[in-house]
A protein has these predicted regions:
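N-terminal basic, Ser/Thr-rich segments that initiate or prime the first beta/alpha elements at protein or domain
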Residues: 1-149
Length: 149
């Protein structure tokens, strides 16, 4: 089975989130430096480091994310530092949603959320899909779950 990759635009979302986090941490470090009348060299260096780590993580995260719908289950592989392989048996799927946050809409993406029997929340979210791909995946999983059940 060939695994499916996410849409490359998901990297934009992940990089922007990393940049926001880096700017918040760098701004806090800069604020402390200004308050203590210290040099801004360390906060600036930390901000650059956080940006580089965030961008690197987003790229590696994109490369590690894959999924495929098999005959009996949905298979996912993801993770940068900790690699996670998930298998969701089709007979356990209760319902499937397509979701588009405001940020996803800005870059033309959507997510598919798979809920399984006996869970309190969303068991699996597949981000970085085009709206059409998310809808197609939702319909396909729904049909396969009905057939499996």
């Amino acid at each position: 089975m060939a695994m499916n990759a996410l849409n490359p635009r998901i990297r934009v979302i992940w990089v922007v989130r990393s940049l926001i986090g880096a700017l918040i941490l760098g701004g806090a470090a800069g604020g402390i430096a200004v308050y203590r009348s210290a040099s801004l060299t360390i906060p600036a260096s930390l901000t650059v480091l956080f940006v580089a780590l965030g961008v690197g993580h987003a790229i590696l995260r994109y490369r590690s994310w894959q999924y495929v719908v098999g005959d009996d289950a949905l298979y996912l592989e993801r993770g940068v530092l900790t690699q996670v392989r998930t298998e969701v048996p089709l007979v356990r799927i209760q319902h499937v949603d397509s979701r588009r946050s405001a940020v996803e809409r800005l870059v033309g993406l959507a997510s598919t959320v798979v809920y399984t029997a006996g869970s309190r929340g969303a068991d699996v979210t597949i981000p970085g899909l085009t709206p059409d791909d998310a809808s197609d995946l939702r319909q396909r999983l729904k049909g396969l779950a009905i057939d499996a059940g």
